[in-house]
Amino acid sequence: MEDIHEHITVVVPRRGINDEGKAKKHALYCLISAAETEYVWMMDDDVVLEVKGERLELKGADLLILPLRMASENERPSLLERLQIAEYAAIQQLTIESAQRGKAVMCSGANLIVRRSRWLESYQDLHPEIPSGDDMFLLESFKRRGLQIMVLDDSRYEAIVRPHTSWRAFFRQRMRWAGKAPKYTDKDILRCGTIVLGANLLQLICPLVLLVKFPIEYRLIKKREPFVSLWTALLLEILYPFYILLSIVGGLLRRGW
């Protein structure tokens, strides 16, 4: 932990407690309990973040969603990396826009500021028996309790995350995400998930659905990551229904990830 000023403590779970073991949420609890500031800034230990802004004004937020961007360390990203960057751009744009409209459906513990006392009050809502998902379950808990959720879409506070370099690691992460889905109860999250799943299953049955879906999702991608090519986005759109189906089946078969 590191104090960056009198109101915020940075909390970074290290490798070894940030893996798939069930100790992760307990470790977060210990770190956040030990903090003495009003807020904690949660981030992953492998993100790249260089704050370029002035003193951060939290304006009474209980949860502040901060921007993330995926970027490869390679000068010429692989196909897998390019697909992940496009997907992540769409996810991030949806995260930002839904939060701005007061109906947040996603957030990421890779770059998140939370009021310490509120996090501790919500700890039992984080499903400690499930290794991952503390960020999404926290979002659900805060929405259910009517707490103040805000978003700051400012590149000065943007953290950089890296794409997976192997298909195996990529699908393991997506299966973990899918495996948590049955635990979600928030109506906005469920509605969004149902629309995404339904549209992609419909595309498997009728490929012409792509003509409706692609312009919507391409807008999300380009707004967040303008350098993603049309062909990368189109390939992602074609493969996405198969990828979602595989992730869901794998995630449900391996519950408890």
PLM regions and their residue ranges:
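Catalytic donor/gating beta->alpha subdomain of glycosyltransferases that bind UDP-sugars
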Residues: 64-90, 120, 125-188
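Membrane-embedded multi-pass helical conduit in multi-pass membrane proteins
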Residues: 192-257
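Active-site acidic short loop of glycosyltransferases
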Residues: 5, 35-38, 61, 124-125
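Conserved donor-nucleotide/metal-binding helix-loop-beta segment in metal-dependent transferases, i.e.
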Residues: 53-64
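Glycine-rich, basic loop-to-helix element that forms the pyrophosphate-binding segment
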Residues: 17-35
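Short beta-strand-to-loop acidic/aromatic patch adjacent to the donor-nucleotide binding site
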Residues: 38-48
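Conserved nucleotide-sugar donor-binding
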Residues: 36-37, 106-123
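Hydrophobic targeting segments
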Residues: 1, 6-12
